[in-house]
Design a protein with these regions (language model features):
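Active-site groove signature of glycoside hydrolases
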Residues: 5-32, 54-55, 62, 173
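Acidic/aromatic/glycine-rich contiguous surface patches that form carbohydrate-binding/processing clefts
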Residues: 160-189
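Glycan-binding loop/region signatures in secreted carbohydrate-active enzymes
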Residues: 87-160
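Substrate-binding surface in catalytic domains of secreted glycosidases
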Residues: 27-120
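Short, acidic/polar
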Residues: 1-12, 72-75, 152-166
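Short acidic, glycine/proline-enriched helix-loop-strand junctions
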Residues: 28-32, 37-47, 129-137, 181-189
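Conserved, mostly hydrophobic/aromatic
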Residues: 20, 88-90, 164
């Protein structure tokens, strides 16, 4: 019933697909639902997009581009090998994180655009570009601890989109609340 309702909404509003952006881990009940929904959407000429933890054969898989380790090129190549290039879509999450070093978990403290700006001004640190991560970074020391800050700009997001396109990945998602302040730069590129 729910799948038919979703399909009806897609038809009524001429949506080309559905993004199933669930929070949390992959629960048992969601995978059969997503398989059924994906099959129905495919039959109607539409696509289903799911986060990687919910990957089902009937859906395109969202690959997060906000990395703190490895390389984005490798990540996209691995995803293409695993799912097929045509099933990979980019989830261009805007990265802004402060990592206290050493950081074995790969998880930092998320920063709002205002916090990032204030931290950059306070530190006066030089900003560099990481080709491996397609992100900007700077480092600073506070209270005797080394910090490494990774962050995205319109330019780094365009770099991630370009890298995906070069690999045949034509679909990407940018969430409006994360990039609303960057839209003029993103759209006028």
């Amino acid at each position: 019933m729910l799948c038919r309702t979703i399909l009806g909404e897609c038809h009524a509003h001429r949506f080309g697909g559905v993004l199933a952006d669930f929070e949390g881990g992959a629960r048992e009940d969601r995978l059969p639902f997503l398989s059924r929904l994906g099959a129905m959407l495919t039959q109607s000429g539409r696509r289903l997009y799911v986060p990687e933890r919910f990957a089902v054969p009937e859906a395109s898989v969202l690959i997060c581009t906000a990395l703190s380790g490895g390389t984005l090129r490798e990540r996209l190549s691995d995803a293409a090998a695993r799912y097929g290039t045509q099933r990979v879509a980019l989830d261009c999450q805007r990265l802004a994180m402060d990592f206290v070093l050493p950081c074995r978990s790969g998880e930092g403290t998320p920063l709002t655009p205002e916090e990032l700006s204030a931290r950059r001004e306070r530190c006066g640190a030089a900003v560099f570009f990481s080709e491996e991560l397609c992100a900007n970074y700077f480092s600073y020391t506070a209270q005797g601890r080394a910090h490494f800050v990774l962050f995205d700009t319109a330019e780094t997001l365009r770099c991630k989109l370009r890298l995906g396109r070069e690999r045949g990945m034509e679909t990407a998602f940018l969430m409006y609340p994360e990039v609303s302040d960057l839209l003029p730069e993103l759209l006028n590129a």
